[in-house]
């Protein structure tokens, strides 16, 4: 079997801890008489609950308690909370403020937090302290790649002894595992593995900065749901609704899939041929959530399930495909909430009171962006969040907005379920602003109806005596004349084609008589068309609207007459040649120049006709 990752950094840390333990400091005034740690490894998010009993053995009162973590562990610390109460004092535990500190004379490979006590701990007094720490990326898949049929094995590294700057009289460690097999674990005296629980200790009389490296290599097939980014938009409408839209980009953060994926094997035996994958996520929505939808880039996803009662609304999100290690998917969840359940009034202000994180269970969000869209006209905006976040403000424009809607943007990294706490956004909003958009709609429809009435009752026609009307009439007349002229010239071109056809028939049959009849018919048609064209040209020339088109028409007439002459001349030459019984080559030589001229003129006439038709 492969060996878990080396512990070189842990060994180096041990040397520093030994040096730190030999440094006398004022921290020796406190003694941890008992330390009980409970580590929950059932998920990919590690939760450690440390119960401490602390005694002040020094001569002076102490107002703070130091918590120490190795840097390699502190960099993955997502949340830390401390609760304390003095012995023999009745009442609930007090939440203690915690901040990062750097005491003098300690190794830089350690990160220290200071818990400020609610009141100084006097000499000889005892304090009960509960510390909850939550770590991300502390459970690593090993091996890093597995096949579809293999279970997922992970490794967790910690210390079997409680790392503290104070001496510890008695300490125990209990590690809760998800079940399944345990490949290996570090064994020390008083180590016991019973079913899904691994215990170390009790260990007594430990000096400050005691550290015993411990590694657990075990099976964990629970969903390693890691969201690369989640954008959560909360839009407030004072017409009675809070609309929430959440965009997810989720990946499986466990061991990557090695080899090919077989859907047939997965569907036939999903709990054997896909034990390390996850096919659904659970989102716990507020009780009165409504208008719930779940979709991705393709569209609505129908493979979701919804349950609701008076206490909660549960949505089971099932992607289109199961997620194995390294795979990812994107989807969107949207739902509405009653306004009166989440927006309240206080001291002349309104405030939104809603949870910060995602409703999806056991999900790690590497980057969460929460956008609170306030109604247009909101001002005096204040934000209260129970933990540090990056805060910005922007403006969003929607339907009928004039100045835009203020948007509060909150951004936080490494968000876990413990961050799903309530936060508040305070703002001032005048109820009169509610009427702005309805009044805009009413005014718009009123103006539209008034415009329709005015339009229906107003004579919009152009006067027959106005210059524009007269110009339009004249232009219509010009267009009518142009259409008639085009029709005449099209007839001329048709007559040209008949002459060409008669020559082809002559070369085929040698019928000179029929060819002469065709020429005579064409000549008569040309004369008739010229008579029809003459009055049209006169009318066109006299119109004031034809100044642009008349030069082209005049050029067209000249080219057409020249084309007719050339056609008739060529026709006569060919007929005479046939009557004289000349050879075909001699005929071609006689009409070659005429043929080129006829083709060029025909092209010019057609171009002029096309130009006139476009005008």
Swiss-Prot record:
GO cellular component entries: oligosaccharyltransferase complex
Residue ranges that the UniProt entry lists as topological domain Lumenal: 29-437
Membrane topology: Single-pass type I membrane protein
InterPro entries: Ribophorin_I
Domain of life of the native organism: Eukaryota
Cleaved signal peptide residues: 1-28
Chain segments annotated as transmembrane: 438-455
Entry's Gene Ontology BP terms: protein N-linked glycosylation via asparagine
Residue positions where N6-acetyllysine is found in the record: 187
Cytoplasmic side: 456-615
Protein's cellular compartments: Endoplasmic reticulum membrane
One Pfam family in the UniProt entry: Ribophorin_I
Entry keyword Glycoprotein: yes
Keywords for this protein: Acetylation, Endoplasmic reticulum, Glycoprotein, Membrane, Signal, Transmembrane, Transmembrane helix
Glycosylation sites: 300, 353, 431
Pathways per UniProt: Protein modification; protein glycosylation
Function of the molecule: Subunit of the oligosaccharyl transferase (OST) complex that catalyzes the initial transfer of a defined glycan (Glc(3)Man(9)GlcNAc(2) in eukaryotes) from the lipid carrier dolichol-pyrophosphate to an asparagine residue within an Asn-X-Ser/Thr consensus motif in nascent polypeptide chains, the first step in protein N-glycosylation. N-glycosylation occurs cotranslationally and the complex associates with the Sec61 complex at the channel-forming translocon complex that mediates protein translocation across the endoplasmic reticulum (ER). All subunits are required for a maximal enzyme activity.
Membership in a protein family: Belongs to the OST1 family.
Quaternary structure and partners: Component of the oligosaccharyltransferase (OST) complex.
Record's protein name: Dolichyl-diphosphooligosaccharide--protein glycosyltransferase subunit 1A
GN (gene name): OST1A
